[in-house]
Amino acid sequence: MKRLLAAAVCLGPGRCGHAAIDTYEFANDAERERFRDLTKELRCPKCQNQDIADSNAPIATDLRREIFRMLGEGKDDQQIIDFMVDRYGDFVRYKPALTGKTALLWFGPAGLLLAGVVVMAVIVRRRRAAPTDGSDALSPEERKRLDQLLDTKTDD
């Protein structure tokens, strides 16, 4: 009885982990590679920042199954991506395409960085070239007094 229980404990967890893995039969290695690339490129609609290859959500399982079906029908990668974008929106792509809607996503950070550098350059330039209105200039009497003070200090 103890041996049977020990065997069940040792073999049981391995079977549970094995049952959770999706298995698909591919025609060739190129198709398997395309499937892997597509599932890594597409984001799970339910999960935040997780691709459908790594997600355990039911919708990710459905999307993997759908990609496998479309690959079997002979559709190319762009057709599959277009289908997913039409169905779930641009959010489903980790790297959204450069369009009018996504231009701000691609160029916004660089534009903000450039604007910050320009603002800093203007501030520095204005501080360096601040015009003196003569308020800090010494009058002839003050200059004479300053020279006297400096001369007495050097004589000591």
Curated annotation (Swiss-Prot):
Residues 140-156 have a biased composition (Basic and acidic residues). One of its GO terms (molecular function) is metal ion binding. The lineage of its organism: Bacteria, Pseudomonadati, Pseudomonadota, Gammaproteobacteria, Pseudomonadales. It is found in: Membrane. GO terms for cellular component: plasma membrane. This is Cytochrome c-type biogenesis protein CcmH. Heme binds at residues 44, 47. Residues 1-19 form the signal peptide. The gene is ccmH. One of its GO terms (biological process) is cytochrome complex assembly. Residues 131-156 are annotated as: Disordered. It is a single-pass membrane protein. Belongs to the CcmH/CycL/Ccl2/NrfF family. Its main location: membrane. Required for the biogenesis of c-type cytochromes. Possible subunit of a heme lyase. The chain crosses the membrane at residues 104-124.
